[in-house]
C-alpha cells in the first residue's frame, strides 16, 4: 500500500511538471482575426453589462470590489461552449471550435468593460462633483465647484480619457513580458484558469463550478426579491435588522443580511475582512462615542448631524489620513522596488550580449519549450509602435482641446502637463503591478487632486479642477496596467497581442457607454443615492470631495484636535505597513491593513460583519473539505455577489415605474412601541 501510494504521488508530481503547451501542441492556434469573433464580442457585451451593474453596486455601497476575473472567465467559458454545442446540435455546418484564445478575448473584453465602472469614478471623483456631495461637505455653496452628473458629458469624458493609457504601454509590451519577465500574478492566474478549462479534466470541473454558481445566483436573486417586499420606508427591511441590539444598531453594529458582502468575504483574504471589522470596532465602538462626549467642547453642539465641523468631520478626515498614509507608504515602496528592479534589469542587459529566452538556468526542458512557443507567437503579430505613438499624440491633442470644454475650471495646460507626465506614471504603475500585483492608479489620482487643486484656485473652481484631473490620471494609469496584465494572460494562452489589444479597446469602448448608463439608472431610480444612511451612500465620493477641499483650502476648516488625530493616524498607517514588511511572515499575517481599516471609519462596521461571516463560512469549509472549498468557494461567492447585484436591475425598474414595496418591517424598543401603540389607539377608527 505504501509503495502504491508513493508511486501515485510520483505520478502526480510528474504530471504537475508536464508542459502546458505540449498538452495543446496538436491544436492549431487561430489567427488574431479568428480570435476576436462576433460571438465572443456578443458574450462579452452581455457579461460586461452584468459585471458593470455588480461593480457599480459595490462602488456605491462601500467601494470594496473583489476580483471578478474567475467569474468572468468561468461564465465566458460556459456561455461559449453552450453556444457552440447548441449550434452543433441544431445541425449548423462549419461551427468554429471554441478555443482558449477566444476565451481569453472574452475575459479581456469583459474585465475592460466592467473596469470602467470602477475607474470611471462614479463612486468617487465624478459623483464628488455633484451638489449632493457638496452639501454634505459643509463648504459654502459655489456653483464654480459643482458639476452634476449628466449622461452626455460622462460618456464623452470617458471616451476622451480612457484610451490614452492603452496606447502609452503598447511599445513596452515586449520589454515587460519577455525581456523583464514580469510575473503579473493576476494575469498569470487567469491564464492558468483559462488553460485548465480547455483540458478534459478542467472542462468537467468548470461545468460543475458553473452549476454551483448558477444555484447560488438564483438563491441570492430570490433573497433580494424577498427582502424588497419589506422595505416600504426609511429604515425598513432586513438591512435595518438590529441583530445585536438597538444600541449596537445605532452604532452601526448589525448584520444586514447582504448576500453580496457575505460573498465578498468568502473571496477576500481573511486579513482584509478582519482589518475591516477591527477598523469598525476601533472607530464606532471606541473613538466616536468618546468624541461625541466632547460635544460642546471640541465642536459646537448645535451643528447639523451631517456637518463636517462636527463628528462627521472626525470620521471623514481621520479616514482620509489613514488612506493617504497607506497610499504614500505603498507608493514609495512600489516605486523603490520598481526603480531597483529596473536598474538591475538594465545592468544585466548591458552585461550580457544576448538575453536568454529561458530566463536562466535551473528550468526544465518542458518550461523552456513553453517559453519558446509562447515567445514565438507573442512576437508574431506586432502592433506598430509608430501607430501607438501617433494615436497617443492625436488623442492627447483632442483631449487637451475638449476636456476644458467639459470642465471649464480645468485649463488646457493642466491637461497638457498631465499627458506629459502620464506615460511615465503609466509605465511605473504597469511595472509595479507586474512585480507586486498592486495597482496604484487611485494613488496617482489623489496626487493629481492635490497638485492640480492647489495649482488652480478655490475661487476659480479648484475643487472641480482637482477632481477632473484625478479622472484624467486614473483613466490613463489604470488602463495601462490592465492592458499589460492582459498581454501576460495572452502570452500564456497563445492569444495574439493584437487580439488582446483589440479586445481591450472594444471592451473599453463598451464600458464608456455601459458604465455611465448603469450609473444613470442608479442615479434616477434611487433618489437618496449618496446620502448617509441610504442604501447607496457612496462614501468614497465624500472622501474625494474633501481631499479636493484640503488641496485647495488647506487644513483650516478641520474641527478641534482633528488635525492632531489625523497626523497620528497618518503616521500609524505608515508604521503598521513598515512593521508588516519588517516582521517575520508568521507575525506579519496578524498585522492589520490600514487601508481596509479606514473604510468603516465613515460607513460603520456592518458590512465588515457580513464579510467576516463570509470568512467564517470559508474557514469552516476549508477545514472540513479543503480541496472542495478551493474548487467551489469562488463560484459560490460569485453566485451570491452576482445574484444580489443583478437584482438591482429589476429593483431600479420598479423604482422608476413608481412601484413601492408593500410592507415596512421596522424594529422599535419596548418603550417606544408602548408610545406608538398608545398613539395609534387614540386615532379615530375608520
Swiss-Prot record:
Keywords: Membrane, Transmembrane, Transmembrane helix, Transport. InterPro entries: OPT, YSL-like. GO terms for cellular component: membrane. GO terms for molecular function: oligopeptide transmembrane transporter activity. Pfam families: OPT. It comes from the Eukaryota. The keyword Cell membrane does not apply. May be involved in the transport of nicotianamine-chelated metals. This is Probable metal-nicotianamine transporter YSL10. The lineage of its organism: Eukaryota, Viridiplantae, Streptophyta, Embryophyta, Tracheophyta. The gene is YSL10.
